[in-house]
Regions:
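Flavin (primarily FAD) cofactor-binding/catalytic cores of flavoenzymes
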Residues: 1-66, 115-237, 243-479
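Long, low-complexity, intrinsically disordered N-terminal extensions of eukaryotic proteins, enriched
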Residues: 51, 65, 82-102, 106, ...
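Conserved N-terminal glycine-rich FAD pyrophosphate-binding loop of Rossmann-like flavoproteins
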Residues: 66-94, 252-268
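Generic hydrophobic, aliphatic-rich segments that mediate packing or membrane embedding
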Residues: 80, 86, 98, 126-129, ...
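A conserved beta-strand/loop capping segment in the N-terminal third of enzymes
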Residues: 93-127
C-alpha cells in the first residue's frame, strides 16, 4: 500500500473535527504568572499541556531541566532498552484521538504492514513520535530550567527556579510534577556499592560512558529491566565480561500488574480501600519487577555474560584499581559497577519541598499495616488524593498542598502503576486535569457566578415566530 503524500493529514483532520481549542476561561489574578506550572517536558508533560489547552485552561507553562530537546526525557539518554516494555496498542498521549496516536503516526510513515510486524515499539521510534507530537501540537518547553524550591504564599505558590544559571522567581496557582522517576525521590543504590569511590560505580540512570567500558570487566547489581538493559548495552559496547548479580534466586518473570489491567480494576483502582491498595503494592514487590523476554535474550546470547542468582553484595573494596568483592566462596574483580536497582520515593528528602516536607501525608501516616505487612519503602510514598494532589498530614496544617499534583512514580502505592509510564496516561491525565479545572473554577466562583448569570443577546426576535402564533377565533373577531 502506498504511503500518504502528507503523513500529517490524519492528525490535521483530527484537530479539525474536534474543533478549535476553547478560549482560556480562568480569570487573571494580579501577581500570578501561571495558572498551571508543569515540571517536566517529557511524554506526560507534553500530554498535560495539550489536555489543559483542550480544557480551556490557559497560562500554562512547561519546564525541563535538560539543556535542549535532545537531552530531555529518558528515551534518548539513559533509557537503554531496544523496545518499550509495554504493548504497542496501549492508549497514550493521543488522549482518545486516533489521529494523534503512535499507530497513526507510524503507519503514515511506514505503512500498516510495518506496524503489524512488531508487538512493542522501538525506543527510538517512540522518541521520534514524541518529538512530532510536541512539534505538531505546538507545545513549547522551556529547556534549561530547573525547579529548586516551592514556597507557599498567600493563595498561590512561589517557584524558585534556575534558568541556565540565572535565578528566577515565578508564581503559579497549580503545579504538576511530571518529572519522572526522581520526582518524588531519587536513585536507590545498595549500601555496599554506594560506598565505593566515585568513578567506580554509577546508577543505571546516570550518563554512563559505555564506550569507555570496552575491554573492561563490568558488574551489574540488580535484576529488574534497567539492570538487564545496562548489561546488554555494556556487552554491545565491547565489555570484556559482564556479570549480573541478583538477590533473588530466580529472575522475576510474572508481570503481576497485568492481572488487574481489565477496565474494572484499572478504572476504579484509585478508589480501592487502603488495605487493598497496600496489599497490591506488597504483592508487586514480592513478585518482583520483570525484565521483558527480549531484555534477557539480549544478554544471554553473549558468552561473556554470567548471571549470579541469590548473590547480594555484602562487601566490596578497591584493590589494585579494581572493585573486589567476595560472593559466596568466590572473589571477583571489576573495573566498573552499575547499580540497576531502581528508585526510592520519599518527598521529605526532596529539597524542592523543604518548606513543607514535614506536612506532607505519607502512606505511613495514613495507614497502619497488619503485622507482617510492614514495609518502610512503601510507607515513605506520598498518600495522594484522587487528583494526584499532596494531602496534609494534619487537617488545616498546609492547605496549599492540594495545589501540587504528583504525576511521577511516587504515586505507585496510591494508584497501582508507575505513574508517568504509558499505562497511566489514559486514566490519570484526565483525572488530574479535571481536578485542576474544578479547583480553579471553584476558587473563582464569585467571578464565574457573575459570568454564568449574566445577560446574553437574544438570537432572534418575536417576528421569527409571529406568523405561527395561534389566535383563537374570539380574539380575531374582537379585533
Amino acid at each position: 500500500m502506498a504511503l500518504p503524500s502528507d503523513p500529517d493529514h490524519d492528525a490535521r483532520e483530527t484537530l479539525r473535527l474536534i474543533g478549535p481549542d476553547p478560549q482560556n476561561w480562568v480569570p487573571d489574578r494580579e501577581g500570578i504568572d501561571h495558572n498551571v506550572f508543569v515540571v517536566g517536558g517529557g511524554q506526560t508533560g507534553a500530554t498535560f499541556a495539550f489536555a489543559l489547552r483542550r480544557a480551556g485552561i490557559g497560562k500554562v507553562t512547561v519546564i525541563d531541566a535538560a539543556p535542549d530537546e535532545g537531552k530531555a526525557g529518558i528515551w534518548l539518554t539513559h533509557a537503554r532498552m531496544n523496545r518499550l516494555r509495554t504493548p504497542k496498542g496501549l492508549p497514550g498521549p493521543e488522549l482518545g484521538l486516533p489521529g494523534l496516536s503512535f499507530q497513526s503516526w507510524y503507519e503514515a510513515r511506514h505503512g500498516a504492514e510495518a506496524y503489524a510486524g512488531f508487538d512493542r515499539i522501538a525506543r527510538t521510534d517512540w522518541a521520534n513520535y514524541l518529538k512530532w507530537y510536541r512539534d505538531f501540537l505546538g507545545i513549547g518547553i522551556r529547556y534549561g530550567t530547573r525547579l529548586l524550591r516551592i514556597e507557599p504564599a498567600d493563595g498561590y505558590l512561589r517557584l524558585h527556579l534556575d534558568a541556565g544559571g540565572t535565578p528566577l522567581i515565578e508564581t503559579a496557582r497549580k503545579i504538576i510534577l511530571a518529572n519522572g522517576f526522581g520526582g518524588s525521590g531519587g536513585p536507590m543504590i545498595p549500601a555496599v556499592p554506594a560506598a565505593l569511590p566515585q568513578g567506580f560505580v554509577a546508577h543505571s540512570s546516570a550518563a554512563i560512558d559505555f564506550a569507555s567500558l570496552k575491554g573492561k570487566a563490568v558488574a551489574v547489581v540488580g535484576s529488574a529491566a534497567s539492570a538487564f538493559d545496562a548489561a546488554g548495552t555494556a556487552l554491545e559496547a565491547g565489555a570484556q565480561s559482564v556479570r549480573l548479580f541478583a538477590r533473588r534466586t530466580s529472575i522475576a518473570s510474572v508481570p503481576i500488574n497485568r492481572v488487574r489491567g481489565y477496565p474494572g480494576a484499572y478504572d476504579n483502582y484509585p478508589r480501592l480501600p487502603d488495605p487493598v491498595r497496600w496489599r497490591q503494592a506488597l504483592r508487586f514487590r514480592e513478585a518482583g519487577s520483570t525484565p521483558p523476554p527480549d531484555a534477557v535474550e539480549r544478554v544471554v546470547r553473549h558468552k561473556n555474560f554470567h548471571l549470579h542468582l541469590g548473590a547480594p553484595w555484602t562487601n566490596a573494596d578497591i584493590d589494585g584499581g579494581k572493585v573486589v568483592t567476595d560472593i559466596g566462596a568466590e572473589t571477583f574483580a571489576f573495573d566498573f559497577v552499575i547499580a540497576g536497582t531502581g528508585y526510592f520515593a520519599d518527598p521529605t528528602r526532596k529539597p524542592e519541598f523543604s518548606n513543607f516536607a514535614a506536612s506532607i501525608r505519607l502512606w505511613r501516616d495514613q495507614y497502619a499495616p497488619a503485622e507482617g505487612e510492614l514495609d518502610e519503602f512503601f510507607g515513605a510514598h506520598p498518600y495522594l488524593g484522587l487528583g494526584h494532589e499532596f494531602l496534609e498530614k494534619a487537617l488545616g496544617e498546609a492547605p496549599f498542598l492540594r495545589n501540587i499534583h504528583v504525576f511521577n512514580p511516587g504515586g505507585f502505592v496510591s494508584f497501582g502503576l508507575p505513574i508517568g509510564d504509558v499505562p497511566s496516561i489514559r486514566r490519570d491525565v484526565p483525572a488530574v486535569v479535571a481536578r485542576i479545572s474544578r479547583d480553579l473554577f471553584l476558587a473563582d466562583l464569585d467571578s464565574h457566578e457573575s459570568r454564568i448569570t449574566g445577560s446574553h443577546p437574544a438570537e432572534f426576535g418575536e417576528e421569527a415566530y409571529a406568523s405561527a402564533v395561534w389566535r383563537p377565533a374570539q380574539t380575531i373577531a374582537a379585533e
